[in-house]
Every structure is written in structure tokens, then in C-alpha cells.
A protein has these predicted regions:
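Short N-terminal helix-initiation segments at or just after the protein's N-terminus
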Residues: 2-12, 71-76, 103-104
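Flexible secondary-structure boundary motifs
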Residues: 75-152, 162-175
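Charged alpha-helical initiation segments
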Residues: 1-63
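A broad detector of short, well-ordered amphipathic alpha-helices
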Residues: 19, 26, 30, 68-71, ...
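Amphipathic alpha-helix face/heptad-repeat signature
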Residues: 10, 17, 62, 69, ...
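Non-transmembrane, amphipathic alpha-helical segments
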Residues: 55-65, 117-120, 154-157, 161
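Short, hydrophobic, well-ordered secondary-structure elements
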Residues: 59-83
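Polyanionic, low-complexity intrinsically disordered segments
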Residues: 16, 32-46, 124, 141-235
């Protein structure tokens, strides 16, 4: 089963959110769901991003959705690890933040110091959950015509950042899975292949400058006029 088809019903919650995060990351890089299978093949075409302000904002939305789903995948992953190793520890460890769980749980339950504070995965998890909090606490703000149409969010939620954070979540999930006698969750391996294949696309998508409010309004006026003209011709 491919990533774009989702995951089997028997898969755990972590796999569901990880799969969704991968799909949103691909969309943020301008890759449609129908092309996900091809990403894991050696021969890949060049990156093609749809032009325009609206397309930019769609990719930004997909980056934000990737961040939200990656955070849910990370939390479900470490909770699944704790429950599978020592269910009686859940109450104690539930008092910790998700990055703290990733750091402490492997040491406590498996004697493995995988994600100490300062490590790449740990620091990316801290950043991931800071961004998640920012998204769920967002407030609208007035913008002038020359201001970025995204309110400056592409500086924090662009495809490159979403890619980095999702990669760390997937690698963290793989490391926790490898602590078992038989590594579990094959979806993690597939997700890592797709994430690796999206690296250059994420960089290219993140390099596109944010449109201004005026540019977005001009594009919307043009599209509205074109739609009206098409309707009149067809009448």
C-alpha cells in the first residue's frame, strides 16, 4: 500500500498521523499525491512549483498541516513506545512534554540515551511543539498592501522547516522501533524514503519569496475577471 492511499485500518495512530504529515509535506513541495510512489524511484524529474500568490499560500497551508500532523505523530509514537514497554509508567511519564518523553523514556525503559537535550531530534521536537502551539493560538492581524500576504509565517512554517521537523520525527520513530527485538511500524521506513526524496524540493519551495497583500489582491481580481469573462462567453 502506498503512502497516498493512507495506512491499513489496523495501523496505530502514530502511523496515521505520520502518513498524513508526509502527504502534506509533499503538497507543500508542489508534489501531488498521485506522484508519491514515483518519489522513491531513482529517476526524478525537476521541481515544478505552481506560480502565483494563491499557490504560494496553499503550499504554506500544507507546511502548517505537516507541522500539526508531525506533532501528533511524535506524541503518538512515544506514547506507543511507553505503553508497549512498561504500561505502568504511563501515568508518571504523561506529566512530561513530548520532547522530554523522547529523552527520558528510552533511558528509563531500555537503557538507551537516544535523544539527550541538545541532540538534533530533541531540539527539533522542541521547535515542532513550539510551532504547534503558535498555530493553535494564532490571532488575525491587520496587514498593509506592502506587507507579506502570509503575515510572515513562511519564515517559520516553510517547506524546508516542515521537512526538517518531519524527518526528525520519522528518525526518532525508527530509533524507538529499533529498540524492540523486531522493529515495528514499516510505515516509518517508507516515510523516511519519501522524506529523503523531498529534500531538494523542500529547499526549492522554501526559496520562493512570499507575495505581498497587494500582489494577492491583484491576482484574485485577475482571476475573478477571467472567470466572469469565461462565464459570459459560455452564456
Amino acid at each position: 500500500m502506498s503512502v497516498r492511499d493512507g495506512v491499513p485500518l489496523a495501523a496505530d495512530t502514530a502511523d496515521v498521523w505520520l502518513g498524513k504529515a508526509v502527504v502534506h509535506l509533499a503538497a507543500a513541495c508542489g508534489v501531488p499525491a498521485s506522484a508519491l510512489d514515483d518519489l522513491t524511484k531513482p529517476a526524478l524529474g525537476g521541481t515544478r512549483l505552481a506560480p502565483g500568490a494563491r499557490a504560494f499560500l496553499v503550499r504554506l497551508d500544507e507546511s502548517r498541516l505537516c507541522v500539526l500532523c508531525a506533532a501528533l505523530a511524535a506524541e503518538a509514537t512515544v506514547n506507543d513506545y511507553i505503553h508497549s514497554r512498561r504500561p505502568s509508567y504511563r501515568g508518571m511519564l504523561d506529566k512530561l512534554s513530548v520532547p522530554e518523553k523522547f529523552s527520558l523514556a528510552p533511558r528509563l525503559l531500555s537503557g538507551a540515551d537516544l535523544f539527550p537535550p541538545g541532540s538534533r531530534v530533541y531540539e527539533h521536537l522542541v521547535r515542532l511543539f513550539a510551532l504547534q502551539r503558535e498555530l493553535v493560538q494564532a490571532w488575525p492581524h491587520p496587514a498593509a498592501p506592502g506587507d507579506p500576504a502570509d503575515g510572515g509565517q513562511s519564515e517559520r512554517f516553510n517547506p524546508r522547516i516542515a521537512h526538517e521537523l518531519l524527518e526528525s520525527v520519522a528518525r526518532g520513530a525508527k530509533a524507538l522501533g529499533d529498540l524492540h527485538e523486531h522493529p515495528y511500524r514499516p510505515t516509518v521506513g517508507l516515510a523516511l524514503k519519501v522524506v529523503d526524496a523531498l529534500a531538494k524540493r523542500a529547499e526549492a519551495a522554501a526559496a520562493v519569496p512570499a507575495p505581498t497583500v497587494a500582489e494577492l489582491e491583484e491576482e484574485e481580481e485577475t482571476l475573478t475577471a477571467a472567470a466572469f469573462a469565461e462565464e459570459m462567453i459560455g452564456a
